[in-house]
């Protein structure tokens, strides 16, 4: 489907957006990826005019205000208001312009905190959100539901891909906004460089997380664009297994070559104990990630120390 078709990607400067642009370019898509300077997605009128002018064949909504536990706790207002506004503006403007295929990207953070995993798509809204990212989760749920309603209409394919935690080339290592794996890379690299013998872990290290390499996720998005009618309205995208936070710290330490000890900060929030997702729908399509966790971490660390953006 890609060759000669016009693909609008929001959030093209983010990690997922960068990986998606690289992947889509190799598949022959004509890519439009406005920056936040070019187009403020929170401005409904501006988004409406932009989409009417560009008339994309398909849209991937990858933009969002994102961050780890600290950022979500510190600024729930913007995590809710900005993410909800962007989703509604992009989805509704696309719908009114009769864009028939849209992929909305969401996150496992939207799942209820009380559900025992693996988390299934039908578990959404079956309980309260995790309090540490409630604003973000609520905004993502709004985006999912509006796409779900449109997807029920004839001739429209508005799908939501619910990603597990992502990492990779183009990641954000700023400790104020980074997610778990880039934060670990930043902390252990600095400990290695300054000769520190210990690194602090939030919590006791037993919370579990599932991570996918961002370029693998980008390839799945492209596959979904090619056959949107084959996927359900919402679909989990993950690797089907998780590790403890301590195991991620240990793996990053091995990749970097640091051999210090870990100290547990039990006064820090840790979020949900586990967010492993059920990927039955994904595997039924034969779509599986290709990059090993250690290989992905090595590629991400090379990007961190060199700044070279090699997407593959």
From Swiss-Prot:
Q: Which UniProt keywords apply?
A: Isomerase, Multifunctional enzyme, NADP, Nodulation, Oxidoreductase
Q: Which GO terms describe its molecular function?
A: GDP-L-fucose synthase activity; isomerase activity; NADP+ binding
Q: What induces it?
A: By flavanone naringenin.
Q: Where does this protein act, in terms of pathway?
A: Nucleotide-sugar biosynthesis; GDP-L-fucose biosynthesis via de novo pathway; GDP-L-fucose from GDP-alpha-D-mannose: step 2/2
Q: Which residues form the active site?
A: 136 (proton donor/acceptor)
Q: Which residues bind substrate per the record?
A: 187, 202, 209
The protein's annotated catalytic reaction(s) are: GDP-beta-L-fucose + NADP(+) = GDP-4-dehydro-alpha-D-rhamnose + NADPH + H(+)
**Pfam families from the xrefs?**
Epimerase (PF01370)
Query: What are the GO BP annotations of this UniProt entry?
Result: 'de novo' GDP-L-fucose biosynthetic process
- What Enzyme Commission number(s) does the record list for this chain? 1.1.1.271
Q: Positions of the site: Important for catalytic activity?
A: 107, 109
> Any keyword Transcription?
no
Positions annotated to bind NADP(+): 11-17, 140, 179
So what family is this one in?
A: Belongs to the NAD(P)-dependent epimerase/dehydratase family. Fucose synthase subfamily.
This chain's function reads: Catalyzes the two-step NADP-dependent conversion of GDP-4-dehydro-6-deoxy-D-mannose to GDP-fucose, involving an epimerase and a reductase reaction.
| PANTHER family for this protein | GDP-L-FUCOSE SYNTHASE
Instruction: Output this protein's name.
Output: GDP-L-fucose synthase
- The encoding gene: fcl
């Amino acid at each position: 489907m890609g060759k000669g078709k016009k693909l609008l990607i929001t959030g093209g400067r983010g990690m997922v957006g960068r990986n998606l642009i690289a992947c889509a370019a190799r598949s022959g898509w004509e890519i439009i990826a406005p920056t936040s300077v070019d187009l403020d997605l929170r401005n409904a009128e501006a988004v409406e005019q932009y989409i009417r002018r560009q008339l994309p064949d398909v849209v991937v909504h990858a933009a969002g205000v994102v961050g780890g536990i600290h950022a979500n706790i510190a600024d729930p207002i913007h995590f809710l208001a900005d993410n909800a506004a962007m989703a509604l503006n992009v989805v509704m403007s696309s719908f009114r312009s009769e864009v028939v295929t849209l992929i909305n990207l969401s996150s496992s953070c939207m799942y209820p905190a009380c559900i025992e995993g693996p988390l299934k798509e039908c578990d959404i809204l079956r309980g309260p959100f995790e309090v540490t990212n409630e604003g973000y989760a609520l905004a993502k749920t709004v985006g999912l539901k509006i796409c779900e309603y449109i997807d029920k209409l004839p001739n429209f394919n508005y799908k939501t891909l619910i990603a597990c935690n992502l990492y990779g080339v183009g990641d954000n290592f700023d400790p104020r906004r980074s997610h778990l794996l880039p934060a670990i890379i930043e902390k252990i690299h600095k400990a290695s460089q300054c000769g520190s013998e210990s690194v602090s872990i939030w919590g006791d290290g037993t919370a579990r997380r599932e991570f996918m390499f961002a370029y693998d996720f980008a390839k799945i998005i492209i596959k979904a664009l090619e056959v949107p009618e084959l996927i359900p309205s919402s679909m989990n995208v993950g690797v089907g297994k998780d590790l403890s936070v301590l195991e991620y710290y240990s793996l990053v330490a091995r990749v970097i070559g640091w051999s210090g000890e870990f100290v547990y900060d039990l006064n820090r929030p840790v979020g949900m104990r586990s967010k492993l997702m059920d990927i039955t729908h994904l595997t039924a399509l034969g779509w599986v990630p290709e990059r090993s966790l250690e290989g992905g971490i090595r590629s991400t660390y090379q990007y961190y120390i060199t700044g070279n953006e090699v997407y593959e």
